[in-house]
Amino acid sequence: MEKVYARTKGIRDDMVSGFCPGCMHSTVIKLIGEVLEEMHLLDKAACAVGVGCCGLHMDYITYDYFLAAHGRACAVATGAKRSNPESLVFTYQGDGDLASIGLAETISAANRGENFTVIFVNN
């Protein structure tokens, strides 16, 4: 039988979602893993993870990550990208982490033209 769908290599296969029913985090995490696998970037990816529900992100992924202090994921991602320019660095942050306490770091990183991606999940 032809396999139509398989779990992405970007997500651990021994984990079951612990997010609340209807929460979009599990969908976003799955999509990130699928895109990184499809583009052959799993071994180059590094994610700065915010706190709160976003912090659960690290339990499900197979690529590199680091947990940042509340609101400081963009500052941590800046250091990661500058120290390893060839890596694909991105942040994964929720609304409280990014739009509340971390807005100054996010705007400052954008103003400096830092070369990383911010994934903002308004949960």
What are these regions (language model features)?
Residues 51-123:
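Thiamine diphosphate
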Residues 1-7:
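Short, charged low-complexity linear segments at domain edges
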Residues 8-69:
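Active-site diphosphate/adenylate-binding microenvironment
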